[in-house]
Structure formats: structure tokens, C-alpha cells
Amino acid sequence: MKSTHSKIKIAHVQLMPLLSGVQRVSLQEFELLPNEQFDINLICKESGPLTDYLDDSVRAFFVPTLCRNISLIKDMKSLISLYKLLKKEKYDIVHTHSSKTGILGRIAARLAGVPCVVHTVHGFAFESTKRKSVKLVYKWLEIFAAKCTTRLICLHNEDKEICIKELYVDPMKISVIPNGVDLEKFAPAINKGDLKEKILGLKRNSFVFTMVGRLWPQKNPLYFAEAAKYIIENNLIPDSVFVIVGDGELMNDLKYNYQTDMNLKKRLLLLGWRNDIPNILKASDVFVLPSLWEGMPLAILEAQSTGLPCIVSNINGNNCLVKNEFDGFLIELNDIDSFINALVRVTDDKVLNIMSKNCRNKIVNGFNIVKRVDKIKDLYIDMVVNK
């Protein structure tokens, strides 16, 4: 049992040092957990936007062999490096994120004798895998890693049910703690037209659809771009502009397929990584996220807090945040016609205004970041004191 008068030493294990959803969830905790109670470290592959953003009180350690794809040699090297680091630093808690680092980090933590091992479920990779053999391997690894876990944090009840029924996790080991939003930082715009001119360089009357996320297959940005192309070429929504914020492996595909035509280039904007996401959302009218799988997307919550109706794929993680035709539209990934139809329908002023109010009210009443971090803090303290 650890005294509550000494600092609790925690290592958060991530893969990439980006500022996408998973990393920003951790960053919220780093910023809001009291320094007098917690000594927080970050372990990731290398330096990057996330580590550049860290407060001086947060130390960063790097494991260069960490990678997203399965590589037996690199994964074994990463496991050994993590084990040595965790053993040396003598953490009270190791808190892992995402599938790959979640598995390696939890196994290494158990081998290193870390007393408390926490994992936040940000969706399951095996849920979106079509190959049965790959799905089976991913699921087996998750089951094994769950045996190394003191506490699982699920962002919604759907993932909790998957943990219980498919990974055989004891329900008493699971806490459901939804993501949260800074309500002041992500408040609705006072003058949206001014922000469209100032932030995006667009006309005040532009109708802006925005997607924010890492440009890789999971986020499915090409699906959004294809729908945008059809709408632009057929002039279905006059003055519409489609904005994609983020970077990643699919950026070149987006440029090659959707930026060679000048009319498309003017109305399908690829902004790359940006540090002014709150202002970009405030300058937008609708948020779009056609992901293949999710945990609980912080990007959706931030967009809703800003008053943006959301058009998102009908998958676990998304469909617990968006109620169809109440605060947005749920679209099926194999039906681009219904996706395009939803993009057109949401431009109706009455629909837009009602959904916008519903979005903001829901976030204010149920997804406050301060309350979320308080729950995380209580969980940490309870685990360490009672271990």
C-alpha cells in the first residue's frame, strides 16, 4: 500500500507522438492532473508534435523500435526496451493506449513488476479486420494482454460488452469513463463568417464541411473526398467547401486523386496538421468522420461542443455519440449515395440550426473534461492505495 502523501509515478505508453485523438486524450490528463499528486512520464516512439507540446513537468522517453505494423523482430526489441525502462523507473502505474502499444506495454509492465497496469480501449483493431486468421490473432493477443491488466477503461458501454463477451474480462475490472471536452475552448462561434474569412480564407457565405484526423485507412479520408468530388462536380451544394485537417500516409493519395483539377483544389482543401483546431471548427458548419473503427472520437465531441452537426459512419464509438437525425446523421460505409444525401440534407437551415443546438446541449450536460479527469484521478488513487 502506497502513502497518499507521496507522488504517484505514472507512465503513459503511446505509439506515435502526434496530436490526434488518442494522444490529445492523454494530453488532457497531463494538463489537468495535479502536479503535487502525480509524476507523469510519456513513453513513445520518437519526438514529435505531442512531445513538443508537453509541459516541462512531463518527462518523455523514446523507444525507436515501436511500430504500428506487426514485425516480430522490432516488436521483441520494443518489448525488451519497454521492460528495461519500466523496471528501471519503478512506476506505480503504467497506462497504455491503442492496440499495439497496449499489448506490448501491458506485457512489459507485468514482467517488470509494475503493481498497477491500466489500458484505455480506443476501439479494437480485430473489429474491422475481415481476414479470419488475422482477427483470431488480434483477439488472442487482446485476451492475453487483458490478463496483464489491473483496470480497463472503456469509453462507452459497447466496448465494455466486447471486453466481457469476447475477451472474457471480469466486469469488475472495467471502468466506463467517456472522453470529455473543454467547454470554453470549444464553444460555438460568435461570428462564423468572420472566421471563415480569417482562418480558412473563404467567402463568408461558404458552407464548410470539415474532417479532422490522421490521414490513414482507419479514418477513411478517401471516402469523404470521393463524396466531396461528386457534390462539387454535380454542383449539388453551391458554395460548399470541403476541408480535411491532418496528415499521414494517405496525404499523397488525396493530392494525386483530388488536387489535380483546379476547381476541386479550390473547394477540397488539404490543410495538413494545424494547431488551431478550435478556430477551424468554429469556422465550419458540419463535421464529418467516416471512420472504419473508433473508440470514442474526441474529434466528434469537440465538433459537437462547437455546435457542429456530425455526419459519421455507423460504427461502435461513433453511434454512441451521434443520434441519427437528432444531432447529425449516421451513414453506412458501403453506401456512398446515402452519405452524399446526408451531406445535402444537413445544409437545410432548419435542420442545421436544430441539430447545432442539440449538439452543444448534449456536450455541456454530459461530456465535461474536468469531470472526466476527476474520475481518472480517483481511479489512479484507488488502485495505488488499495493494491
From Swiss-Prot:
It is an enzyme of class 2 (transferase). One of its GO terms (molecular function) is glycosyltransferase activity. Pfam families: Glyco_trans_1_4, Glyco_transf_4. Keywords: Glycosyltransferase, Iron, Lipopolysaccharide biosynthesis, Magnesium, Manganese, Transferase. PANTHER family: GLYCOSYLTRANSFERASE. Belongs to the glycosyltransferase group 1 family. Glycosyltransferase 4 subfamily. Its EC number is 2.4.1.343. It catalyses: N-acetyl-alpha-D-glucosaminyl-di-trans,octa-cis-undecaprenyl diphosphate + UDP-alpha-D-galactose = alpha-D-Gal-(1->3)-alpha-D-GlcNAc-di-trans,octa-cis-undecaprenyl diphosphate + UDP + H(+). The keyword Glycosyltransferase applies. Pathway: Bacterial outer membrane biogenesis; LPS O-antigen biosynthesis. The keyword Magnesium applies. CDD domains: GT4_CapM-like. This is UDP-Gal:alpha-D-GlcNAc-diphosphoundecaprenol alpha-1,3-galactosyltransferase.
